[in-house]
Amino acid sequence: QTFEQAEYTIKTEDWPSVKRVPGTIKRVSWADGKEVIKDVYLENQRAHSGGVIRETWWLDYTLNRASKPNNQAIYYSSGGKAEGYVIYRIAAGTFEIVEWNYLTNTAFKALAGFIGSHSGSVQSFHWINGFAGKDLNDLMPTPAASVKILPYMMARIVELQTFLEKYPFQSGEKETYSLEIEDSYGPWNEGIWTITIDEQGKATVTKGAAEKEGTAALKADIQTWRSEEHT
């Protein structure tokens, strides 16, 4: 499992009271807000668990479907910079947070206040977001959210040689390893590979055994190596 998500359900009476902060929040149409939302997301994705680079067509498909119309609100700092947004919909007494991103703590507080301002018209708030070990309760004065951790995205190594040559190994002494790979979905990855890692942590990868007898020091399928990379 590469990424997990946290699912939050919060009663309106448990949503934290947030003091007013500088800046403004503007409700915008999808057409008017799309580029700003895209820019904030890209700036924030390095700290966003499960964040990926999204094409414009994918944004339109996931966030602007006619069958599930959304609302958009963007937070602008007192200096006029867009620092956060929330995409949401209200249905059946629930404020559904479709996507919530913020670049600063002030933007988080402003948007939390905006969300909370809907307490009089809904019974609960619901949000599913990437999970990186900490949840929304860590940002609240009094933890009140019901949280479920859900499996989300998996990953695999597509081209072993390219992956290893780009991987940032630790610097140190020069070392050479021999790996035998099994990959039923990518036969180009199968075989015995020799990996030499130099003093700067840069790998050189060639197909073929380092040892004369042609046996690999380590043997596993491709998903095992992907799993080890995340441990």
Model-derived segments and spans:
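Active-site-proximal cofactor/substrate-binding loop regions of enzyme domains
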Residues: 1-15
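Intrinsically disordered, low-complexity, positively biased terminal segments
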Residues: 13-229
